[in-house]
Swiss-Prot record:
Belongs to the bacterial ribosomal protein bL9 family. Binds to the 23S rRNA. Disulfide bonds: none annotated. It comes from the Bacteria. It comes from Synechococcus sp. (strain CC9311). GO terms for biological process: translation. Keywords: Ribonucleoprotein, Ribosomal protein, RNA-binding, rRNA-binding. The gene is rplI. This is Large ribosomal subunit protein bL9. The lineage of its organism: Bacteria, Bacillati, Cyanobacteriota, Cyanophyceae, Synechococcales.
Length: 152
């Protein structure tokens, strides 16, 4: 088997790894593609020290983000119920459906904090009533909120 060389990636490469990862690659791949285009740097003690420093800062940043997410989940639990107003027809059937964007707007209006609509999991809602909605606040923190759909 051919000798492999270690490099530290300067950017995310789909088939290889993320920025700051230490990866083993073929010497030709490193020499002909990664190094000349600035996508990676060869491993040296100074580079390893920078990588460790970057990882420590990233771990600290992630811990702070997680604490903020837990605090926001507590705020969502304190509020308890969020209301979305939709137009209805007969028998409390909605014209359309409740979307992630509708829920994000309801959360934003109540908390004054923006939530990405892609992080909200809404069940199929076609009638007025109460529903449970999942909100992903962090990779390790999710909140379940009560959503009240009412007619206007």
């Amino acid at each position: 088997m051919a000798k492999r060389v270690q490099v530290v990636l300067n950017e995310d490469i789909l088939s290889l790894g993320r920025n700051g990862d230490l990866v083993d690659v073929a010497p030709g791949y490193a020499r002909n593609f990664l190094l000349p285009f600035g996508k990676a740097v060869p491993v040296t003690p100074a580079v390893m020290k920078q990588v460790e420093h970057r990882r420590a800062k990233e771990a600290e940043r992630q811990a702070t983000l997680k604490q903020d997410a837990v605090a926001f989940r507590t705020a969502l639990d304190t509020i308890g119920r969020f209301t979305v107003k939709k137009q209805t027809g007969g028998d409390d059937v909605l014209f359309g459906t409740v979307t992630n964007g509708d829920v994000a707007e309801a959360i934003e209006s109540a908390t004054k904090k923006e939530v990405d609509r892609r992080d909200i999991t809404v069940p199929d809602i076609h009638r007025t009533g109460s529903y449970k909605v999942q909100v992903k606040l962090h990779s390790e923190v999710t909140a379940e909120i009560n959503l009240e759909v009412v007619s206007y």
